[in-house]
Amino acid sequence: KGIIPNQLYLCRSTFICMPPVIRFSKLSKSQKIDWLVEQHLNSSSTARETLTQYWNEDQKLQDLHDGFSENTVTNFYFPFGLAPHFLIDDQLVTIPMAIEESSVVAAASKAAKFWLDRGGFKTQIKGTLKSGQVHLMYHGLGSEMDAFYAFAKAELLESLEQINASMKKRGGGIQELSLVDKTKNLKGYYQLHATFETRDAMGANFINTTLEQLATTLKLKASQFQGFSSDVPEVIMSILSNYVPECVVNVSVSCKIDEIGTINGVTGADFVRKFAQAVDIATVEPYRAVTHNKGIMNGIDAVVIATGNDFRAVEAGVHAYASRDGQYRSLTRARIAV
């Protein structure tokens, strides 16, 4: 049931041969589990029990979780831990962390406790802007695109007033809009580049909705503009960017070297010297930088997941930022002040 019958299926010998399942999304949760157990788990008598024991006893809560994604059969749990002792800008806070890797929460807590008596963590918000683009193709003259943008800009912005109203009340909304000529990188490629302030929200839905409206208005204005010698610009896609080099926070800690003490037989001075050199190596050597930054993201991802945010977006943006000058580098710097 639910399987295409009477057909010949070819497969590599290293894979299990089985017919493709059809209308899988239409099967009930129980039927999906039956299929999984029969096709992939050797009809194990304990497999169904293992899957169902991770269901939430509260059916309403389980239904809520099932609705987050598609074709769900069970829940995948992460340990949800707490890292206390964090003194951030003179405010003592406890950090939630959801991660399956051992020692990450312990290391964060230990580091926080060390810095607690040494001024804690200091932050500097360098920027909070996010961006998105309407990607366009136009194979006429660049001067024609410039003239069209001048013709359309006011109405492009006016068309966003209703979408931006709620975000503006919170001090956010679209900040700037510009036409960017990318034809040196790709023939005929232009973009409308928009920057946004989304306050405490990641703002993905808001940004995408705004960009889609820009694309709709752009198509309308293009049909009214008489200055194109070629076809009108074609909208390829309208979407936010997870690369946010203008949304950056610096975090720093500092103390005297003699406060480090001896660590596993290594003097504080030697430890600090080697620590700074290790960071310098990660700054110039991508092989080291990747693992160095992975360790940093252990903690960041854990907080992002624990707070219900999109860790894939953060990961993508962070690693792009680490490569912003053309080479992948360390996200951190260490300096010994004489």
Spans of model-derived segments:
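Glycine-rich anion/phosphate-binding loop at the beta-strand->alpha-helix junction
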Residues: 209-219, 227-338
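Conserved alpha/beta core surface patches that mediate binding of polyanionic ligands
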Residues: 66-78, 109-121, 158-184
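Short beta-strand elements
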Residues: 82-88, 179-184, 188-198, 251-261, ...
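Intrinsically disordered, low-complexity linker/loop segments enriched in Gly/Pro
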Residues: 139-215, 286
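Acidic/polar, glycine-rich intrinsically disordered N-terminal extensions of enzymes
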Residues: 15-93, 97, 101, 121, ...
